[in-house]
């Protein structure tokens, strides 16, 4: 009886594992589930895109006298990134099966690069605030931001071009590792400047409601963005070596749902909610046009 009792947990675990595996395979192979999940992602991205557009319009109506500020560009890029993702998942059948394969890579990777550019814009903004508060030079920060983004896009274009001419598994592996490295750089940027600005605000001698709000804003956005980019880095790196975890394929709808909800949809929605406050109508030191 004792031996039987000891075997029961293992047997139950085995049965549960088999049932979950069977369900996972059934869902992945079901056209109905595939369509349902990808259309759900389409709807989620469309909703976030609409929220970003509404917020952009509200900001423009609030301060129409200013040009393209960092805040406006950030919301515009969120609108574009999430809108493009919504279209891609809305036409998932055509996108995942498009030929040549390099074109499929372009369609699926480009929104991820735009997501990187949009959110590292926050890193740039915080870096400028931190440097100004420390009386450090800020003239090279935007040059660095632009240079890093240009380098990332040029490298990615090179990978796409090579895949177009010589499609092989080695180049695909390099492409995935490159995306993982780019995601790690973004996570590091948030940890570095988000963390610095957070601790600088904590040491600020004057206690005020505005300081507490800004502290909560910086801390929350830093934690969210660092986590989502780090998860993207790990998942993409692992998927490069494990075909069972391959993303952006029709027969892995559940994996795609979990991945994109965790690394893009939920972080975007949370950040837009946290940064929902409209800028003041009068000129502020924290709200200035992009030069």
Swiss-Prot record:
Mutant lacking the gene: phenotype: Reduced efficiency of intracellular multiplication of tobamoviruses (e.g. crucifer strain TMV-Cg), characterized by a reduced accumulation of viral coat protein (CP) and reduced amplification of TMV-related RNAs.
Protein source organism: Arabidopsis thaliana (Mouse-ear cress)
Known function: Necessary for the efficient intracellular multiplication of tobamoviruses, probably being a membrane anchor promoting the formation of the replication complex.
Pfam families cross-referenced by the UniProt entry: THH1_TOM1-3_dom
Stated name of the protein: Tobamovirus multiplication protein 1
One GO term (biological process): viral replication complex formation and maintenance
UniProt main location, coarse: membrane
Lineage: Eukaryota, Viridiplantae, Streptophyta, Embryophyta, Tracheophyta
Keyword terms, alphabetized: Glycoprotein, Host-virus interaction, Membrane, Transmembrane, Transmembrane helix, Vacuole
Keyword Membrane: yes
Gene name per UniProt: TOM1
């Amino acid at each position: 009886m004792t031996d039987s009792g000891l075997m029961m947990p293992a047997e139950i675990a085995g049965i549960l594992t088999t049932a979950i595996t069977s369900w996972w395979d059934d869902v992945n192979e079901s056209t109905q589930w595939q369509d349902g999940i990808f259309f759900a992602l389409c709807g989620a991205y469309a909703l976030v895109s609409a929220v970003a557009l509404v917020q952009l319009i509200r900001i423009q109506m609030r301060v129409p006298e200013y040009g393209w500020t960092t805040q406006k560009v950030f919301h515009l890029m969120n609108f574009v990134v999430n809108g493009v993702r919504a279209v891609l998942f809305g036409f998932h059948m055509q996108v995942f099966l498009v030929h040549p394969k390099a074109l499929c890579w372009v369609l699926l990777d480009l929104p991820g690069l735009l997501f990187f550019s949009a959110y590292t814009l926050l890193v740039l903004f915080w870096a400028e605030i931190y440097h100004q508060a420390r009386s450090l030079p800020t003239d090279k920060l935007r040059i660095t931001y632009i240079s890093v983004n240009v380098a990332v896009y040029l490298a990615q274009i090179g990978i796409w071009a090579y895949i177009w001419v010589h499609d092989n598994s080695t180049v695909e592996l390099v492409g995935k590792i490159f995306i993982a490295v780019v995601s790690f750089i973004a996570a590091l940027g948030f940890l570095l400047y988000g963390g610095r600005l957070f601790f600088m605000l904590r040491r600020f001698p004057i206690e005020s409601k505005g300081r507490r709000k800004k502290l909560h804003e910086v801390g929350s956005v830093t934690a969210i963005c660092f986590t989502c980019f780090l998860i993207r880095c790990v998942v993409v790196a692992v998927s490069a070596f494990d075909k069972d975890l391959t993303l952006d394929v029709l027969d892995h709808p559940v994996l795609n749902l979990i991945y994109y909800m965790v690394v893009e949809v939920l972080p975007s929605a949370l950040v837009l909610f946290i940064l929902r406050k409209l800028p003041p109508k009068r000129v502020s030191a924290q709200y200035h046009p992009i030069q």
